[in-house]
Amino acid sequence: MLVDDIRWQRCDIKSTSLLGNVLQMNDAKSAGCNEILMHKNGELTEGGASNIFFVKNKTIFTPELSSNILPGITRHQVIKIINDKKLNFEEGSYGIDDLKEASSIWFT
């Protein structure tokens, strides 16, 4: 379920103030969805309790770390494996439309 990222501006800080995530995840579950994909003004941020990766043209992409993204432990490990395997990988700023061309999308 695609939702506006309504959280406070320092999402990179893990805190007990995850009410925005919880409320939107509850809405998603009520709508029959397992996860939400948040964005700010069309720019991908992260899932409700996860980071997002996608593949397009044989390259793996994930949004770069910013104040809108919590640097998850699993995200870090996935990036380490990608680099160890020398796979094509880019961190950057990606929009909702980038996912329309993706061959696969996953949350960590």
What are the functions of these language-model segments?
Residues 1-108:
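Helix-start/capping segments and mature chain N-termini
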